[in-house]
């Protein structure tokens, strides 16, 4: 059976991993889909992080 074109990916906050002095413990993660033919590189989006209490860059993780 062939693989589908759309993948479910996870986006993780980059500042939560590196900053121990934040508002609350934990790491912000979002799930979304991407088209593997149109977007072959790792996805980076600016999303709100409730742990940092601000908008930060969220990068795609495996």
UniProtKB/Swiss-Prot annotation:
<dbReference type="InterPro" id="IPR011332">
    <property type="entry name" value="Ribosomal_zn-bd"/>
</dbReference>
<dbReference type="GO" id="GO:0005737">
    <property type="term" value="C:cytoplasm"/>
</dbReference>
<dbReference type="GO" id="GO:0005840">
    <property type="term" value="C:ribosome"/>
</dbReference>
<keyword id="KW-0687">Ribonucleoprotein</keyword>
<dbReference type="InterPro" id="IPR001705">
    <property type="entry name" value="Ribosomal_bL33"/>
</dbReference>
<protein>
    <recommendedName>
        <fullName>Large ribosomal subunit protein bL33</fullName>
    </recommendedName>
</protein>
<keyword id="KW-0689">Ribosomal protein</keyword>
<dbReference type="GO" id="GO:0006412">
    <property type="term" value="P:translation"/>
</dbReference>
<dbReference type="InterPro" id="IPR018264">
    <property type="entry name" value="Ribosomal_bL33_CS"/>
</dbReference>
<dbReference type="GO" id="GO:1990904">
    <property type="term" value="C:ribonucleoprotein complex"/>
</dbReference>
<dbReference type="Pfam" id="PF00471">
    <property type="entry name" value="Ribosomal_L33"/>
</dbReference>
<comment type="similarity">
    <text>Belongs to the bacterial ribosomal protein bL33 family.</text>
</comment>
<dbReference type="InterPro" id="IPR038584">
    <property type="entry name" value="Ribosomal_bL33_sf"/>
</dbReference>
<dbReference type="GO" id="GO:0003735">
    <property type="term" value="F:structural constituent of ribosome"/>
</dbReference>
């Amino acid at each position: 059976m062939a693989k589908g074109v759309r993948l479910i990916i996870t986006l993780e906050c980059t500042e939560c991993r590196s900053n121990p002095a934040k508002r609350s413990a934990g790491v912000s993660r979002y799930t979304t889909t991407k088209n593997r033919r149109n977007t072959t590189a790792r996805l980076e989006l600016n999303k709100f992080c409730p742990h940092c209490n601000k908008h930060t860059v969220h990068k795609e993780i495996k």
